[in-house]
Curated annotation (Swiss-Prot):
Function text: May be involved in signal transduction as a component of a multimeric receptor complex.
Name the UniProt record assigns to this protein: Membrane-spanning 4-domains subfamily A member 8
Originating organism: Mus musculus (Mouse)
Subcellular location: Membrane
Segments passing through the bilayer: 109-129, 139-159, 175-195, 221-241
Similarity comment: Belongs to the MS4A family.
Keywords, comma-separated and alphabetical: Membrane, Receptor, Transmembrane, Transmembrane helix
Annotated coiled-coil segments of the chain: none
Tissue: Expressed strongly in intestine and colon and minimally in lung and ovary.
Length: 290
């Protein structure tokens, strides 16, 4: 039996270290995978498994809005991945108020103002009836505009408020937009009628034409027409703005693209294969030499 000499032991240990050094870069290359968040460079010759979590970049593969993102195809020499539902810990998206909700809140305020304008029209129209027996000629009152105009203003304002409370109802939203446009047209008609009232009755407010009592009725009628003219101008602006906001919300409902959040992928455990020529241990070499 041949006993190992000191020189042979040195040669064996040297060959062992050289083989380990040549295997070490190969093991590091097998451990690193593209897109991983960490790299394990343990030089243990035995098989080991490590779970690798990869996050797909947003531009790594195309995503069509409104469709389920497909799993990207990886080469056969790389581990296949599967989707994990949810978000990474600590990466919860910030909860922000959508623009459509902010627009609807503005529409609710404008709708409340429209209701008040409609009530003012009905109230001042009732006061104008008391001046029918004077020399004041209310053309707008003969057409009944303070009443039917005020009713339409109240209806359009109520629909604007209801659209904010039920933002997912397309019927309320479309009805609010349509009635706001109609209210804007009605307020434009009312502006022309009240301007006509003021222009006709303004020549009768001087004391030389009628006694004081009749002149007071004309002054009261002109003052009421002036106030209603101001409210009609306000209603025209509010109805136009409400229609604009309603169209914006309708566009947000019909053309709302889906928000694409990058998915989290988990690769299958990577098993480091053993080298084709495993490193012999010192005891095995000694036994073989014997």
């Amino acid at each position: 039996m041949n006993r190992p000499t000191a020189q042979g032991a040195v040669n064996l240990s040297g060959s062992k270290f050289s083989t380990a050094k040549s295997w070490e870069p190969e093991q590091e290359r097998l451990t690193w995978q593209p897109g991983t968040v960490s790299m394990n460079t343990v030089t243990s010759p035995g098989p080991m498994a490590n779970s690798v979590y990869v996050v797909a970049p947003p531009n790594s593969y195309p995503v069509v809005p409104g469709t389920v993102p497909q799993m990207p195809i990886y080469p056969s020499n790389q581990p296949q991945v599967h989707v994990i539902s949810g978000h990474l810990p600590g990466l919860v998206p910030a909860m922000t108020e959508p623009p459509a909700q902010r627009v609807l809140k503005k529409g609710q305020v404008l709708g409340a103002i429209q209701i008040l304008i409609g009530l003012v029209h009905i109230g001042l129209g009732s006061i104008m009836i008391t001046n029918l027996f004077s020399h004041y000629t209310p053309v707008s009152l003969y057409g009944g505009f303070p009443f039917w105009g005020g009713i339409w203003f109240i209806i359009s304002g109520s629909l604007s408020v209801a659209a904010e409370t039920q933002p997912n109802s397309p019927c309320l939203l479309n009805g609010s937009v349509g009635l706001n446009i109609f209210s804007a047209i009605c307020s434009a008609v009312g502006i022309m009628l009240f301007i006509t009232d003021i222009s006709i009755s303004s020549g009768y407010i001087y004391p030389s034409y009628y006694p004081y009592q009749e002149n007071l009725g004309v002054r009261t009628g002109v003052a009421i027409s002036s106030v209603l003219l101001i409210f009609c101008l306000l209603e025209l602006s509010i109805a136009s703005v409400s229609s604009h906001f309603g169209c914006q919300v309708a566009c947000c409902h019909y053309n709302n693209p889906g928000v694409v959040i990058p998915n989290v992928y988990a690769a299958n455990p990577v098993v480091i294969p053993e080298p084709p020529n495993p490193i012999p241990s010192y005891s095995e070499v000694v036994q073989d030499s014997r």
